[in-house]
Amino acid sequence: MQKKLDCLRLKTWFLAEKRDLPWRQTTDPYAIWISEVMLPQTQVAVVIPYFLNWMQRFPTIRHLAAASLDEVIKTWEGLGYYSRARYLHEGAKELVARFDGELPRHEELLKKIKGLGPYTIGAILSFAFHQKKAAVDGNVIRVLTRYFGLEEDIAKPATVNQLRHLAQSLLPDEEPWIINEALIELGATICQRKARCHAC
């Protein structure tokens, strides 16, 4: 029998211990999109002021689309990975042209937007629209492979796809987005690269 995830225990832990992060205080799809593009390979403490400044400078998709690329790059300056800023700018223009400046609620439509990959799409659908959709980033991959004792090579796309299916199967019908956030939080704070198993 496959090992099961104790969603209630995980949810209880998360609600008690979660970090107070600005993008967790909103269900605005645009704000969540920006945070999820900024966060990979970047420390949360570094991202917070950039996120707050970005949202003040470009409060909506339309504001971002109307800005010049130079202004967008200058606002992003210091975060690195400048292609992300360009993709955000191009994506915003596309959203204005095709979806009236709104992020759509449907996965197939989100896939059409340049720069949106499986994780970011899952995060938007889950955290903004509260859909039952897994959001599998590096933190979640680490948690699942350790918890379920998986030894497959996570560098292989087939393994990542398998983990996405596993994560999807673990989500409860009630408040599934909290389990997504909890798995990410667990990987970011306890189940880190250097495991803190004693704290889990």
Question: Where in this protein do the model-derived segments appear?
Answer:
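Catalytic cores of DNA base-excision repair glycosylases
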Residues: 2-198
